Amino acid sequence: MPTTFTLLESSPTLTHVAIIGALDLVGTREIELKLTASTAGRHKPVIIDISQVHFVASAGLGLLIQIARSLITDKHSTILLAPNQTIQQTIHVSKLGSMLRIALTLEEALEMAKLPAVSIVRT
Protein backbone atom coordinates (compact mmCIF):
# COMPACT_ATOMS: atom_id res chain seq x y z
CA MET A 1 0.00 0.00 0.00
CA PRO A 2 1.51 3.36 -0.99
CA THR A 3 1.99 6.12 1.54
CA THR A 4 -0.37 9.05 0.99
CA PHE A 5 -1.34 12.28 2.66
CA THR A 6 -4.51 14.31 2.65
CA LEU A 7 -4.85 18.04 3.19
CA LEU A 8 -7.63 18.32 5.79
CA GLU A 9 -7.53 22.06 6.45
CA SER A 10 -5.77 24.98 4.85
CA SER A 11 -6.88 28.14 6.64
CA PRO A 12 -5.16 31.50 7.08
CA THR A 13 -3.97 30.38 10.52
CA LEU A 14 -3.33 26.64 10.23
CA THR A 15 -2.49 23.69 8.00
CA HIS A 16 -3.78 20.24 8.96
CA VAL A 17 -2.75 17.12 7.04
CA ALA A 18 -3.06 13.38 7.60
CA ILE A 19 -0.51 10.79 6.52
CA ILE A 20 -1.50 7.19 5.87
CA GLY A 21 1.06 4.41 5.54
CA ALA A 22 4.71 3.99 6.44
CA LEU A 23 7.26 6.77 6.50
CA ASP A 24 10.01 4.44 5.38
CA LEU A 25 12.39 5.37 2.56
CA VAL A 26 9.90 4.57 -0.21
CA GLY A 27 6.88 6.10 1.54
CA THR A 28 8.77 9.27 2.40
CA ARG A 29 9.87 9.73 -1.20
CA GLU A 30 6.28 9.26 -2.39
CA ILE A 31 4.97 12.23 -0.41
CA GLU A 32 8.01 14.39 0.38
CA LEU A 33 7.67 17.19 -2.19
CA LYS A 34 3.91 17.65 -1.96
CA LEU A 35 3.85 17.34 1.83
CA THR A 36 6.63 19.90 2.22
CA ALA A 37 4.87 22.33 -0.14
CA SER A 38 1.55 21.84 1.67
CA THR A 39 3.05 22.38 5.13
CA ALA A 40 6.35 24.26 5.33
CA GLY A 41 5.56 26.08 2.10
CA ARG A 42 2.53 27.75 3.70
CA HIS A 43 4.44 29.26 6.64
CA LYS A 44 1.62 28.49 9.10
CA PRO A 45 1.45 26.21 12.15
CA VAL A 46 0.93 22.63 11.02
CA ILE A 47 -0.83 19.64 12.53
CA ILE A 48 0.28 16.35 11.01
CA ASP A 49 -2.11 13.54 11.87
CA ILE A 50 0.03 10.40 11.99
CA SER A 51 -2.51 8.15 13.70
CA GLN A 52 -2.44 5.92 10.61
CA VAL A 53 1.36 5.85 10.31
CA HIS A 54 2.62 2.56 11.68
CA PHE A 55 6.35 3.06 11.07
CA VAL A 56 8.77 5.99 10.81
CA ALA A 57 12.28 5.32 9.50
CA SER A 58 15.13 7.82 9.60
CA ALA A 59 14.05 9.20 6.20
CA GLY A 60 10.56 9.92 7.53
CA LEU A 61 11.90 11.44 10.71
CA GLY A 62 14.21 13.60 8.60
CA LEU A 63 11.25 14.86 6.57
CA LEU A 64 9.33 15.80 9.71
CA ILE A 65 12.40 17.57 11.11
CA GLN A 66 12.90 19.44 7.83
CA ILE A 67 9.30 20.70 7.95
CA ALA A 68 9.63 21.69 11.62
CA ARG A 69 12.91 23.55 11.07
CA SER A 70 11.40 25.50 8.22
CA LEU A 71 8.43 26.54 10.34
CA ILE A 72 10.49 27.37 13.44
CA THR A 73 12.16 30.21 11.54
CA ASP A 74 8.68 31.79 11.35
CA LYS A 75 7.97 30.85 15.00
CA HIS A 76 5.33 28.33 13.91
CA SER A 77 4.81 24.92 15.49
CA THR A 78 4.79 21.44 14.01
CA ILE A 79 2.44 19.17 15.94
CA LEU A 80 2.26 15.42 15.45
CA LEU A 81 -1.28 14.25 16.17
CA ALA A 82 -1.91 10.83 17.70
CA PRO A 83 1.40 9.07 17.05
CA ASN A 84 1.60 5.45 18.16
CA GLN A 85 3.65 4.53 21.22
CA THR A 86 6.72 3.55 19.20
CA ILE A 87 6.78 6.87 17.34
CA GLN A 88 6.28 8.78 20.60
CA GLN A 89 9.27 6.95 22.11
CA THR A 90 11.38 7.69 19.03
CA ILE A 91 10.62 11.42 19.33
CA HIS A 92 11.38 11.34 23.06
CA VAL A 93 14.62 9.33 22.81
CA SER A 94 15.80 11.53 19.93
CA LYS A 95 15.14 14.62 22.09
CA LEU A 96 12.99 16.15 19.36
CA GLY A 97 9.99 16.94 21.56
CA SER A 98 10.52 20.70 21.45
CA MET A 99 10.72 20.65 17.65
CA LEU A 100 8.05 18.02 16.97
CA ARG A 101 5.33 18.53 19.55
CA ILE A 102 3.06 15.58 20.30
CA ALA A 103 -0.70 15.91 20.83
CA LEU A 104 -2.96 12.98 21.58
CA THR A 105 -6.20 14.74 20.62
CA LEU A 106 -7.19 17.24 17.95
CA GLU A 107 -8.30 19.70 20.63
CA GLU A 108 -4.85 19.53 22.25
CA ALA A 109 -3.18 19.98 18.84
CA LEU A 110 -5.30 23.03 18.04
CA GLU A 111 -4.30 24.64 21.35
CA MET A 112 -0.62 23.87 20.72
CA ALA A 113 -0.85 25.43 17.25
CA LYS A 114 -1.70 28.77 18.87
CA LEU A 115 1.61 28.80 20.77
CA PRO A 116 4.84 30.03 19.19
CA ALA A 117 7.45 27.43 18.34
CA VAL A 118 10.44 27.07 20.60
CA SER A 119 13.70 27.85 18.87
CA ILE A 120 16.25 25.07 19.04
CA VAL A 121 19.50 26.24 20.59
CA ARG A 122 22.58 24.30 19.56
CA THR A 123 25.56 24.10 21.87
Write out the residue ranges for each language-model feature.
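Conserved catalytic submotifs in the C-terminal HATPase_c
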Residues: 11-12, 51, 107
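General small-molecule cofactor/ligand-binding pocket signal
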Residues: 6-8, 81, 101-103
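Short leucine-rich amphipathic alpha-helices used at interfaces
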Residues: 5-6, 45, 114
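Amphipathic alpha-helical interaction surfaces in cytosolic regulatory modules
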Residues: 22-100
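A charged, well-structured terminal subsegment
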Residues: 104-123
